[in-house]
Amino acid sequence: MGYDLPPLREPDLPRTAKVRPVALRTGWTTGACATAAAKAALTALVTGVAPAEVEIGLPAGRRVRFPVARCDRRDEGAEAVVVKDAGDDPDVTHGAELTATVGWRPVPGLALEGGPGVGTVTKPGLGLAVGGPAINDTPRRMIGEAVAEVVDLTAVGVRVVISVPRGEIMARKTTNRRLGIVGGISILGTTGIVRPFSTASWRASVVQAVQVAAAQGERTVVLCTGGRTERGARALLPELPEVCFVEVGDFTGAAVTAAVTHGLSGVAFVGMAGKLAKLAAGVLMTHYTRSKVDLSLLGAVTAEAGGTADLATAVTAANTGRHAYELWEAAGLLGPAGDLLCSRVRAVLRRFAGDAVAVDVAMVDFTGARVVASSGRWAR
């Protein structure tokens, strides 16, 4: 190997990327809204009075109040609606009407069910029963605690059905189908609070996607940086099922760690020049606030691939990783330089994984339609 191995780094996001200089408004998770709706409906059932707002507890201990959009008695039960406010987060469930229908049951305790618009779990790996509603553990616990604030569950039985009008349509814009959740959205949330543009939630979704692939018996995951790279990856590996393809964004390191943790045997990474350059420099969390494209590395790759001194200088002075790619392409050096770049990325990922998994790397063009370079199983 004719170059110094870079140190491996998986930096955290800086505080300024988590808390924006101009404060963005937080919102409420589907789980928190479902909890508020359940408490409102049960309050109406018990007291005969429809509350205009209800207070619930969040997992961290904070108490918050939610306006109730609609609440009424129905036959032997009651129904309430809380409209989700996702704050400034671009959430497909913003404005969703989290609806709780409650009634009595003959045995003490709480029975929690999913109604129309709430997804059904069809595959293992989510920590939820296959065949049951996609209501995660924290919302389940929150709903149970809220119900227990209204009635004594050791003495009476309560049935709560959570539904979401248009939930099945909303779910089309989520990864639910890939994870094996069909028919609607998931009732989610670990804190009750939606933090705008939450990188933490994206990282968690990446880890969960790898976990689901492993739970379904898959041995390889294909890490893609976005929709275009995923299209290229699917063309490259058409034999793999959809669950194997994971959109990692900036969280390659987290995905590789999850693959090792869950005993997978192979990781393939498919990306474009900029992300590959960051990974080749040993940076496993590639958010723009924590890493820049190392153009000197690309200049060194240019020289190693047989490029002229003038080309290496031009690549080192390029504006972006894409600009460097275009310079390689114009000089007829895209294949050799791209292969070397992929080889460096493969070496980094193998070191990061501790040689626990086989690693393959491919670079696609900026449409995602064409693989232009590779290392590993596709090495030319």
Curated annotation (Swiss-Prot):
Disulfide bonds: none
Pathway: Cofactor biosynthesis; adenosylcobalamin biosynthesis; cob(II)yrinate a,c-diamide from sirohydrochlorin (anaerobic route): step 6/10
Keyword ATP-binding: no
Matches recorded under NCBIfam families: cbiD, PRK00075.1-1
Pfam families, alphabetized: CbiD (PF01888)
Record EC number: 2.1.1.195
Gene Ontology MF annotations: cobalt-precorrin-5B C1-methyltransferase activity
InterPro entries given in the database record: CbiD, CbiD_sf
Record field: catalytic activity: Co-precorrin-5B + S-adenosyl-L-methionine = Co-precorrin-6A + S-adenosyl-L-homocysteine
One of the GO BP terms on file: anaerobic cobalamin biosynthetic process
Keywords, in A-Z order: Cobalamin biosynthesis, Methyltransferase, S-adenosyl-L-methionine, Transferase
Protein name: Cobalt-precorrin-5B C(1)-methyltransferase
Domain of life: Bacteria
Top EC class, one word: transferase
Native organism: Salinispora arenicola (strain CNS-205)
